[in-house]
Amino acid sequence: RILSSMKEGEKVLDMFAGVGPFPVMLSSKAKLIVANDINPSAVYLLQKNIRLNHLHNVVPVLGDAMNLPHMLDSMKFDRIIMNLPFAAYGFLAGAAKLAAKGAVIHLYALVEKEGEHNEDILRAFPNAKITERFLRSYSPASWHAVYDIEVGDEV
């Protein structure tokens, strides 16, 4: 779904890359993918995944996502993946600093009701267009959801 919505040559940031499923999938269209994770074992396996899949446009980063705006300084990204369902919304302010004009952010979250994180999103991106999709049931009272956030030109 994300790959089909991408344009050729996008710069992508995966804030919580793990072993790299999103970077591997998106590398065919992206100009550059910065794949970050705080877990050294995950980054080691990400590097291995990059080698095994012959990916030349994926840059692995070992770091805390809270520090990414400082670490990546003036870089801006066309697409940001935030797949940390228990806590990704807590990193929206950092994502706002890294989003290019017109960027799309994919925020994965566990929710109990529709629109649960809209206020958090609108605090970081006041004029964003938000589309929420429920992916699957997580427990009897919660859902795994994705918020597709179209930033617009406000950044």
Q: Where does each model-flagged region fall?
A:
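Rossmann-like S-adenosyl-L-methionine
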Residues: R1-V155
